[in-house]
């Protein structure tokens, strides 16, 4: 198979020699053959030496590298990559586990498949394209996925309506590529939850907090718990199973509150310990008393672009300052950032600023990140997006 060619400017191949999976538009000297959005191209150095192969896209990231070998991108290629991804999840005990039938099967660059996310919920895989190329190749990828997963996955739902660039004119759609089961209850560490892959955020659930939710369960016994930005209520029902005295879930979205209540009822029917509130987080923190001794702050990304970083850090400081002000002495604070442009150092500084302003004595108990099924490609450290701290507040 002969692909159209992209030639780099002199010296711009150095990052690719270090296996970074992105070719930025500013590194390109010329493009031969006018490739379409999402088309596979070969990348050459200024000396006309092959260096990489990937999906072409108009934008700051011009090529997302699929391989550093000169090979054909076909169904066999997708099968090989998906088989490696599945083997990793098996090693994490996330496949055929009677207590857990949900995991992230493909995590973009972390699985050497930039632009592709696949989450598995029971017998349904939710596939999401974040690049034009993965959208163009979606049907071939779905076929490969079916072959690799066998009976593990019987339904494939494609959910990319909100993740693709509008300018690409790709006709993104949401819908089943294979099957079509209405069953949307999955299992995580023995707890059940509804997955709204039709209209929910991301692929329908935040799989990346699985291990952090499990950790929270250990701290919940006898505590009054506040779960801010609760979305589907994941932290809430782990706290309930951990023996919390009461659990309050807060989210500005009434739809999220409905889903939280459904999930609590699914696991703890009629349990009076839980109450949910559809309210702005900052307003709730302003008006609440000092009844809570375990608080979870897991907000949506405050910054999706670097130009929003300064405002995002102010937002994290303000949010955590409210929690430090109100949490009971001896309380535990779980605080997170999922903003990729906010690194660990920036996030810690924002939280430390809030702690200093509060005048409270604060200790770090745990430093948290994403789980093993959200691997970070060592050559693409930008993939480490989830940061968290567990703090003891005197």
Q: What are these model-derived regions, one by one?
A:
Residues 332-394:
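C-terminal catalytic and target-recognition region of SAM-dependent MTase-like enzymes
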Residues 222-231:
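Conserved class I S-adenosyl-L-methionine
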């Amino acid at each position: 198979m002969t692909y159209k060619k992209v030639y780099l400017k002199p010296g711009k191949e150095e990052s690719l020699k270090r296996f970074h999976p992105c070719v930025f538009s500013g590194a390109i000297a010329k493009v031969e053959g006018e490739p379409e959005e999402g088309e596979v191209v070969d990348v050459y150095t200024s000396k006309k030496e092959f260096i990489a192969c990937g999906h072409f896209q108009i934008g700051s990231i011009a090529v997302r590298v699929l391989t550093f070998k000169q090979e054909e991108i076909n169904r066999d290629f997708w099968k090989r990559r998906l088989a490696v991804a599945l083997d990793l999840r098996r090693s994490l005990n996330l496949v055929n586990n009677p207590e857990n039938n949900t995991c992230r099967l493909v995590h973009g660059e972390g699985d050497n498949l930039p632009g592709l996310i696949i989450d598995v919920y029971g017998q349904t895989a939710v596939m999401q394209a974040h690049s034009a190329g993965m959208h163009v190749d979606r049907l071939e990828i779905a076929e490969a996925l079916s072959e690799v997963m066998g009976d593990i996955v019987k339904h494939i739902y494609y959910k990319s309506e909100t993740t693709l660039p509008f300018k690409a004119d790709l006709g993104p759609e949401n819908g089943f590529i294979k099957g079509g089961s209405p069953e949307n209850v999955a299992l995580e560490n023995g707890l059940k939850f509804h997955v709204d892959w039709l209209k929910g955020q991301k692929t329908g659930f935040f799989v990346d907090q699985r291990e952090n939710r499990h950790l929270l369960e250990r701290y919940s016994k006898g505590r009054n718990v506040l779960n801010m930005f609760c979305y589907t209520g994941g932290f809430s029902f782990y706290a309930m199973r951990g023996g919390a005295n009461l659990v309050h879930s807060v989210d500005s979205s009434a739809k999220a509150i409905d889903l939280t209540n459904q999930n609590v009822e699914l696991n703890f029917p009629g349990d009076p310990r839980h109450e949910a509130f559809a309210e702005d987080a900052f307003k709730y923190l302003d008006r609440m008393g000092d009844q809570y001794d375990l608080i979870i702050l897991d907000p949506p990304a405050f910054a999706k672009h670097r130009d929003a970083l300064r405002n995002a850090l102010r937002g994290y400081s303000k949010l955590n300052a409210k929690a430090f002000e109100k949490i009971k002495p001896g309380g535990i604070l779980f605080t997170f950032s999922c903003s990729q442009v906010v690194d660990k150092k920036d996030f810690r500084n924002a939280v430390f600023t809030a702690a200093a302003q509060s005048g409270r004595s604060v200790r770090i108990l745990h430093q948290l990140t994403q789980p093993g099924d959200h691997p970070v490609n060592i050559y693409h450290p930008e993939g480490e997006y989830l940061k968290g701290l567990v703090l003891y507040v005197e």
